[in-house]
Design a protein with these regions (language model features):
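A contiguous, basic/glycine-rich beta-loop/short-helix subdomain that forms a polymer-engagement track
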Residues: 1-18, 29, 38
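Short, solvent-exposed helix-loop connector elements
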Residues: 174-187
Length: 246
């Protein structure tokens, strides 16, 4: 099967559900019929969100692993890339995914509050793993939406839920220049947004960065030109005019 499927799994905690997103990657064709490139010469791909799934609160991790394994063992999803939230309690769960030996290329991703992307190897497995600032994930989604390269199939049962999460998602920059992210409504969640963002980030990052053997750090745009005064901005207008809904 073509290696064009990327799955993102956001692992929830006691008050947050876990969520799974499946994206299909396809090249953007230029006027000459070749794969289009951006201003830096990087190849351009678009991503169609084919599947969204939210697990009920309280779903045990072995049940989530079983469901994901069921999906990746289906003929159309074998050899998919699977990026898993390894933040906090997610670390031992990632090890359980590796132990399952499901037919997927598993990549752990730890969400951080810093300003650099770090790449290293995961424990004894030797698999590539990333530590990624949350603003980097958000910026990736913003860029893809603004260039109309991220779309969702509107018939998906959770398509409207994802849209609400996108509309509610806000960025707050504090006086100390630290970003905080999340829903602007009490009791709302951002699990679907993060599942999509992790999958999209991994796909975009692997296009631009080859496999490397040693730990490496990549500066992010978030580390530059930070405001010195508190700023709160909703990013909802960008979602509305982006052409996100096919």
């Amino acid at each position: 099967m073509p290696h064009d499927i990327v799955m993102g799994l956001d692992l929830g905690q006691a008050t947050d559900p876990s969520a799974l997103a499946i994206l299909r990657e396809s090249p953007v064709s230029g006027a000459d019929g070749r794969i289009a490139r951006d201003h830096r010469g990087e190849l351009l791909f678009r991503y169609d969100c084919l599947h969204l799934e939210r697990f009920p609160l309280g779903t045990e991790y072995p049940a989530i692993i079983g469901r994901v394994e069921e999906l990746v063992r289906s003929p159309k999803l074998q050899r998919s890339r699977l990026v898993i939230d390894a933040t906090g309690a997610g670390r031992p769960v990632v090890d359980l995914f590796f132990n399952s030996r499901m037919p997927a290329e598993i990549t752990p991703l730890t969400i951080t509050a810093g300003s650099e992307v770090r790449e290293d190897r995961w424990n004894r497995t030797g698999n590539r793993a990333y530590w990624v600032p949350k603003i980097e994930l958000v910026s990736t989604v913003q860029s893809l939406l603004q260039t109309r390269r991220l779309r969702v199939v509107p018939r998906l049962a959770l398509a409207d839920m994802l849209k609400r999460e996108l509309l509610d998602f806000k960025i707050k920059v504090t006086a100390s220049a630290n970003e905080t992210f999340g829903s602007g409504r009490e009791g709302a969640h951002d699990d679907l947004v993060l599942a999509v963002a992790m999958a999209a980030w991994l796909a975009e990052h692997q296009i631009c960065q080859p496999m490397i053997a040693a730990s490496r750090r990549f500066p992010t745009p978030a580390s530059r030109d930070r405001p010195t005064q508190p700023v709160r901005r909703a990013i909802r207008p960008m979602w509305i005019r982006s052409g996100f809904w096919r």
